[in-house]
């Protein structure tokens, strides 16, 4: 505690749903320990969403792109490189305003790690904590690129302590050794996170110690690392946070189709759930192959196809397959993964989705697209052994017959029993990690002690 008041943690996420959700859940965990938590959101996102953050206070600030948010910037790099003085002054003003209202900051949590934010923390007398929302394995690759130990584009296999043998197609950012550029700003942004890391007081990771123990034990980073995941609502894990059944922040409106009632009518472990997240955009050819693969499995399915992607579906697909399949534009993924009827999760292997699949014990079929996804899919199949990764052919997309093979392998094949057994084991470990005395629970308590029982105030 500071000056007899509650310790106050400020959270500054990257303004995207996949980054806000985990840091918001972390904030709820901190609040459950009687800490004040404030998430700093942009005006654009606050105006675009109906948030229900629960015990976390929301404070809005202008990022200079109020009408359109990050997508209104010329590029991702331009957004994150916007003038330091402008961004820093606004955050210092917010910190001073909170301080004047009796809510002095204790810790500033950042994602990613911009230098201006580190300077804000220092000027305001706050601790700074770098919050990483991707797995340690992926950031290990970025760290080696930053240090010059891995040269891009990568053409040879990569062998590093603590990591499985990696081919260029397994590496993060984009496949084929960073060769197929989906977002030209992404690699520099990810790599340059490590530029300012030595200025942070601590690192928080949305991971589980048991998932990446070798890497975490062998970390060469110049600061303490705390694994605080999985950052999934408590209802699905330890149930220690009251009424915490949803993230409380959603840029998309869930489909009104009664998909849970539909699931209730299905047998246990019989339904394929397909979702490629909030950002991935499949080509029309890939969409067609997924559709043909689903038909070929002859199994019930729910497929999330965002409104912007519906035109890519084959003509009459929804109507012709209505007897055994649903197409919805958005849904509550946790509800689907937790349902007893769900037997397989076909996923792009974004880290949040991967962690949800692990935490809820659902076997996975990985169809990675870009960023960290290929490496996450590698771990799903070869390290944690909770699913399989679909192979690509020719035009770099997954054919329908390969999709069918993977689904059948996970749900009915020779390895399906072992995959389900592994999924159940990791599910238990995930729940144990955030339960009283678990690895993540201990890390969260250590984080609180270091941030709040010190004369220096902190910023996450």
Curated annotation (Swiss-Prot):
| UniProt GO MF annotations | quercetin 3-O-glucosyltransferase activity; quercetin 7-O-glucosyltransferase activity
Q: What does the entry list as the binding residues for an anthocyanidin?
A: 19
Q: Which GO BP annotation is one of this protein's? A: carotenoid biosynthetic process
InterPro entries reported in the protein's UniProt record: UDP_glucos_trans (IPR002213), UDP_glycos_trans_CS (IPR035595)
The kind of enzyme this is, by top-level EC class, is: transferase
Q: List the CDD domains hit by this protein, alphabetically.
A: GT1_Gtf-like
> What residues does UDP-alpha-D-glucose bind to?
133, 333, 348, 351-353, 356, 372-373
- Under Enzyme Commission nomenclature, its number is 2.4.1.271
Tissue note: Mainly expressed in fully developed stigmas.
Active-site residues annotated for this sequence: 19 (proton acceptor)
The record's keywords, sorted A to Z, are: Carotenoid biosynthesis, Glycosyltransferase, Transferase
Catalyses: crocetin + UDP-alpha-D-glucose = beta-D-glucosyl crocetin + UDP; beta-D-glucosyl crocetin + UDP-alpha-D-glucose = bis(beta-D-glucosyl) crocetin + UDP; beta-D-gentiobiosyl crocetin + UDP-alpha-D-glucose = beta-D-gentiobiosyl beta-D-glucosyl crocetin + UDP
> What function does this protein fulfil?
Crocetin glucosyltransferase involved in the synthesis of crocin, one of the apocarotenoids responsible for the color and bitter taste of saffron.
Q: Say which family it is in.
A: Belongs to the UDP-glycosyltransferase family.
PANTHER family noted in UniProt = GLUCOSYL/GLUCURONOSYL TRANSFERASES (PTHR11926), GLYCOSYLTRANSFERASE (PTHR11926:SF1553)
Name of the featured protein: Crocetin glucosyltransferase 2
Question: Which source organism?
Answer: Crocus sativus (Saffron)
């Amino acid at each position: 505690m500071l000056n007899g008041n509650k310790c106050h943690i400020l959270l500054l996420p990257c303004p995207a749903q996949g980054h806000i959700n985990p840091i918001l859940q972390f904030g709820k965990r901190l609040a459950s320990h009687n800490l004040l938590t404030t998430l700093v959101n942009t005006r654009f996102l606050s105006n675009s969403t109906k948030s229900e953050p629960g015990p976390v206070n929301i404070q809005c600030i202008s990022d200079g792109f109020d009408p359109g948010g990050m997508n209104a910037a010329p590029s991702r790099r331009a957004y994150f490189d916007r003038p330091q003085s402008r961004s820093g002054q606004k955050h210092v003003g917010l910190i001073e305003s909170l301080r004047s209202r009796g809510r002095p900051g204790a810790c500033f949590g950042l994602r990613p790690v911009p230098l201006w934010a580190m300077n804000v923390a220092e000027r305001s007398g706050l601790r700074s904590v770098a919050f990483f929302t991707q797995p340690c394995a992926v950031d290990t690759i970025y760290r080696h690129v930053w240090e010059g130990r891995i040269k891009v584009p990568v053409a040879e296999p990569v062998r590093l302590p603590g990591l499985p043998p990696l081919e260029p197609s397994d590496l993060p950012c984009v496949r084929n050794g960073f060769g197929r550029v989906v977002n030209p700003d992404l690699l520099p942004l990810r790599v340059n996170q490590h530029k300012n890391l030595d200025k942070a007081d601590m690192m928080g990771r949305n991971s589980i110690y048991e998932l990446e123990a070798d890497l975490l034990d062998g970390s060469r980073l110049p600061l303490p690392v705390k694994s605080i995941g999985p950052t999934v609502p408590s209802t699905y894990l330890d149930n220690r946070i009251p009424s915490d059944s949803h993230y409380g922040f959603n840029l998309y409106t869930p489909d009104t189709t009664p998909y849970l009632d539909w699931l209730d009518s299905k047998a246990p472990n019989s339904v394929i759930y397909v979702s490629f997240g909030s950002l991935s955009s499949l080509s029309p050819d890939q969409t067609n192959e997924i559709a043909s693969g689903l038909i070929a499995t002859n199994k019930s399915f729910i497929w999330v196809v965002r409104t912007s992607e519906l035109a890519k579906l084959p003509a009459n697909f929804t109507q012709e397959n209505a007897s055994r399949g649903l197409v919805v534009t958005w849904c509550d993924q946790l509800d689907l993964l937790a349902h007893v009827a769900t037997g397989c999760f076909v996923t792009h292997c974004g880290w949040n989705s991967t962690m949800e699949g692990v935490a809820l014990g659902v076997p996975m079929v990985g169809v990675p697209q870009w960023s960290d996804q290929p490496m996450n899919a590698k771990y799903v199949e070869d390290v944690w052994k909770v699913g399989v990764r679909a192979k690509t052919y020719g035009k770099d997309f997954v054919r329908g017959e390969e999709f069918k093979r993977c689904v059948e392998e996970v749900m009915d094949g020779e390895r399906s029993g072992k995959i389900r057994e592994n999924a159940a084991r990791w599910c238990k470990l995930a729940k144990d990690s955030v339960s009283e005395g678990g690895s993540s629970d201990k890390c969260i308590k250590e984080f609180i002690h270091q941030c709040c029982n010190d004369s220096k105030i902190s910023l996450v």
